[in-house]
Amino acid sequence: MEAPGIVWVEESVSAITLYAVWLPPRTRDCLHALLYLVCRDAAGEARARFAEVSVGSSDLQDFYGSPDVSAPGAVAAARAATAPAASPLEPLGDPTLWRALYACVLAALERQTGRWALFVPLRLGWDPQTGLVVRVERASWGPPAAPRAALLDVEAKVDVDPLALSARVAEHPGARLAWARLAAIRDSPQCASSASLAVTITTRTARFAREYTTLAFPPTRKEGAFADLVEVCEVGLRPRGHPQRVTARVLLPRGYDYFVSAGDGFSAPALVALFRQWHTTVHAAPGALAPVFAFLGPGFEVRGGPVQYFAVLGFPGWPTFTVPAAAAAESARDLVRGAAATHAACLGAWPAVGARVVLPPRAWPAVASEAAGRLLPAFREAVARWHPTATTIQLLDPPAAVGPVWTARFCFSGLQAQLLAALAGLGEAGLPEARGRAGLERLDALVAAAPSEPWARAVLERLVPDACDACPALRQLLGGVMAAVCLQIEQTASSVKFAVCGGTGAAFWGLFNVDPGDADAAHGAIQDARRALEASVRAVLSANGIRPRLAPSLAPEGVYTHVVTWSQTGAWFWNSRDDTDFLQGFPLRGAAYAAAAEVMRDALRRILRRPAAGPPEEAVCAARGVMEDACDRFVLDAFGRRLDAEYWSVLTPPGEADDPLPQTAFRGGALLDAEQYWRRVVRVCPGGGESVGVPVDLYPRPLVLPPVDCAHHLREILREIQLVFTGVLEGVWGEGGSFVYPFDEKIRFLFP
């Protein structure tokens, strides 16, 4: 029975963002949030809708992960973010607070009005007295609405004092310069007002372009009208708990649902400056409640993050997706489709809020405890014994070399994510009421989509470790169950002529007791092993009440005749029949490392192809000759690239190579915006002292640098090669001595 006074409309929703946050009168432990819903009807016409939710301080603390946050504190931050002229980058102060607030408000929306979905037909029930959507249901009309893109190209010259950047980095060692730039702009917001800016936005029906020598003055170049791009819409509302009726003034996108920007040249300060200009222009006239102006992304974290994104939490009200500028056209389209699908599947909250898209951090311990209590004793014991430093399957202690013998690599693709979803379902009773059901259903949907959708796999690859980081008990549970699964794999393997020799998590490899010359028998044994291992894992999970939405599927990832291992993670697999190979555990940190890997793989082929006849001493001597020749070739080829800083540059994450940056690096302007996590460093010799690391991406092209310290880079790469070759000598011949390439004595003179 439908509630009286509610008007129902059938529309789809393309984005949900924060508009305003406040404390009701005489209340300190509960906040109210007004959400802006960008909708369109069956004819494609855009509509502005709003919904209101209430959030208690305890809910906010659950999503924050600690009691160090309150409703008044969140309201103060949101209120400050409505004035971008004075505070254009409020989330920089506490990005975790904004993640918690956004995730908490979305969860409250589903809890208080019904289950939402983006780009699918919905029945929205709104109250004419308040102007607010109060109920939502799935509609039956038509297929999902296809998301529509608008291409965004924006460049801005935001002059930031290099000394201010240097000061921010000095205060936070290891800080990424994208964050340092935003922090400096936050501290001096006037520099955003004086920025020069050029923007072009192309939709299916319009082209909008503006150029400003400074945002403090009108544009010097204009193409298209702002009204062709957006509609400025005012809606009168009477929110609950608000002392008076308010007017919301929003932008409605015309003919598109999101912006797409080229990621390689993407600049968060440029986009913030553009949106700040729009916010100032649209809300220059009085009479409307100013909306929240807040964003998240790796540039808002001191040490950044490996995934590039720009999350719009408030104004202008729809998302911006970034794709690599160098991506081929078809690849770029796939990336954009994946970004839109991720946005729809997670209500626009991924990756900004992380695992909070499923459950708040403080909800996972109860789920983990409930799930663990439902396991059989053997699994409970495995969970209790498991430790993060526990070794994985490792029958062959490195260094080792085997072959010719049939070996194969297998993987239960996506098993960890499937187990997380199944364990969460098993422990759902540990949640208070039904507060986590929508998030758990969302996790199930991601797991179901993962086999066919790369975007879903990408979400799960980051969601699982993020959830485990938020809850050590969940990490313990998932690690213990994975260990029990690995034990089941080992026990089953012996019955199918298979010995598991190594692996990590759901991926493992092993040897088959089959005639090395009988390829047909090997194929049959591999298929028998796959079926038996798959069935045994399914059975043991089912016996413990762990029922993944999709039955775990085991896939062979390669068949080989030789294996060389040199460390717990380093291994080279080779099939001498078709010359296919697979290398793991060798660092590919740059072009020079990749060249070294190719030379090394070629040398391993030459060594293993040599006949075993003759005294072992001669074989060892010949192998050492091949190894030294390989190193010679690599070093001589590298000599030809001695002036190429791009070739020698090495990719480093935060904390690995945090040498003091040269002061010239802080003068790179917008180039610094791209340093959001990784830093490519090359060692150069400025003269008069030791070599120093220079971040090559912070300087304009063509690079003008002191001579590259090739010897430094070569020693590091040769150290990795020597580790592999030493493993071959010990694994094949039991040779006790290590392989050491005489770089300094033999060829160092080439690199002064």
Swiss-Prot record:
Family under the similarity heading: Belongs to the herpesviridae HEPA family.
Family annotation (InterPro entries): HSV_HEPA (IPR004996)
Protein purpose: Component of the helicase/primase complex. Unwinds the DNA at the replication forks and generates single-stranded DNA for both leading and lagging strand synthesis. The primase synthesizes short RNA primers on the lagging strand that the polymerase presumably elongates using dNTPs. The primase-associated factor has no known catalytic activity in the complex and may serve to facilitate the formation of the replisome by directly interacting with the origin-binding protein and the polymerase.
Keywords linked to the UniProt accession: DNA replication, Host nucleus
Name of this chain's protein: DNA helicase/primase complex-associated protein
Assembly notes: Associates with the primase and the helicase to form the helicase-primase complex. Interacts with the origin-binding protein. Interacts with the polymerase catalytic subunit.
GO process terms (BP): DNA replication; viral genome replication
Organism: Human herpesvirus 2 (strain HG52) (HHV-2)
GO terms under cellular component: host cell nucleus
